[in-house]
Amino acid sequence: MSAEPSGITLVCFALRREAAPFAKSAAARPRLRTLVTGIGWDNAAREVRAALAAERPRLVLSCGFAGGLNPDLPAGAVLFAADAETGLGPALLAAGARPARFHCARQAACTAASKRAAWAATGADAVEMESQVIHTLCHQQKVPCATVRVILDAASEDLPLDFNLLMTPDQRLDPLKLALTLVKSPAKVRALLRLGSQSRRAAGQLAGVLARALGLEHQGQ
């Protein structure tokens, strides 16, 4: 790993659909790199460790969806927790993001009941599955880091499926398990399509906040 930061800002997402709107707006910015890590601690650790070893960035962002835990926060709210060294706090506030506490879980919180339990246990505003390990790796290398996440599902919402039951051991969605589940419960198809639409809106909202906070809109984006 190089001793000095490269000037690159590394923006990490678990899933391509989370990353797509931001990646499009950042495509012409050579100092902005988008990294899709895969879901969960292990995938994030592997991909971010490799990225840090290849080229030390000046800044790392952990971005994507989160589940709401604080019942006062609606779906679509963009939240952040940033190291002071990032210097991003004022820009994120001005872009419409709210400061928050995140709980980094090993499994998805798919029901309102599980989110209530997580809120009671942690006091966090939102739950996701990658940021803690990303922050830890960055702090080990003295690279400033921030988490910027959009609430996909509010605290009171159940997801249409228990996605934990549909994952492979390496935290990928198993298409066969998904297909079998939908065959058994065809009524879930409509709810899953609604979630897809909701996720596209959320990804766009997150991309807008990131673009404003990182100055892309002032650079012709």
Regions of interest found by a model, annotated:
Residues G7, A20-Q221:
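Glycine-rich phosphate- or other oxyanion-binding loops that anchor nucleotides, phosphorylated ligands
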Residues T9-R17:
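Gly/serine-rich nucleotide phosphate-binding loop at the start of the catalytic core
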Residues M1-E4:
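Short boundary motifs at domain starts and secondary-structure transition points
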